[in-house]
């Protein structure tokens, strides 16, 4: 029996999978075939989560969550099911599993394949996104999928990434806002208020982020 280990970085991403409260850094059974691990942001956290899931006996790994667009054609809500992951090396995706999932999606879902790039930190300018796109040829970027793909490759188990575009090329969260984000992606409201009061973040930018 296949057991899929889902690695998610953000609490909001976990809520897309289950309405249950998901603690950080703990294996949570979603159903008999799926377990979830809320890792927090970044490659190191995702790597540890994937390794723990492998030790727990999962037979395949998936990186689930959001991504930033590197292609101007991509819009928020588009779904990226990549062909490969561009990290330190070009990492494979289990295309049979990916294709099976893609064929089960609603025809209303905009699905994009191609390459998903890795970034060690959030990209906060259009210029940095376009530069990474030029270097990698990727259509989107995240901070965790490369780490999960590496663990899967080392364990010789299948891997896919499932990433929804959250910010287009022309808009990115301001760098100052990142200091107000907790490890699970939730907001430190007092820190955000302080940033607004000292005008580090225009209130219009927060409204644009929805």
Where are these regions (language model features)?
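Extreme N-terminal starter segment of soluble prokaryotic enzymes
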Residues: 1-5, 34
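Gly/serine-rich nucleotide phosphate-binding loop at the start of the catalytic core
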Residues: 7-16
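Glycine-rich phosphate- or other oxyanion-binding loops that anchor nucleotides, phosphorylated ligands
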Residues: 15, 20-210
């Amino acid at each position: 029996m296949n057991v899929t280990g889902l690695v998610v970085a953000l609490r909001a991403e976990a809520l897309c999978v289950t309405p249950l409260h998901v603690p950080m850094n703990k294996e949570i059974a979603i159903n008999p075939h799926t377990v979830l691990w809320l890792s927090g942001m970044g490659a190191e956290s995702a790597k540890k989560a994937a390794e723990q899931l492998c030790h727990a006996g999962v037979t395949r790994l998936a990186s689930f969550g959001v991504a930033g667009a590197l292609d101007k054609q991509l819009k928020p809500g588009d779904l990226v099911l990549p062909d490969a992951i561009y990290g330190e090396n070009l990492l494979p995706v289990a295309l049979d599993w990916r294709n099976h999932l893609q064929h089960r999606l609603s025809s209303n879902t905009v699905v994009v394949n191609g390459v998903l790039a890795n970034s060690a930190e959030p990209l906060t300018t259009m210029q940095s996104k376009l530069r990474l796109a030029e270097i990698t040829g990727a259509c989107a970027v995240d901070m965790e999928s490369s780490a999960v793909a590496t663990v899967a490759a080392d364990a010789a188990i299948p891997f896919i990434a499932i990433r929804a575009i959250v910010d287009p090329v022309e808009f990115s969260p301001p760098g100052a806002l990142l200091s107000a984000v907790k490890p699970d992606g939730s907001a430190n409201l007092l820190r955000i208020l302080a940033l607004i009061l000292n005008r580090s973040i225009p209130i219009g930018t927060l409204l644009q982020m929805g």
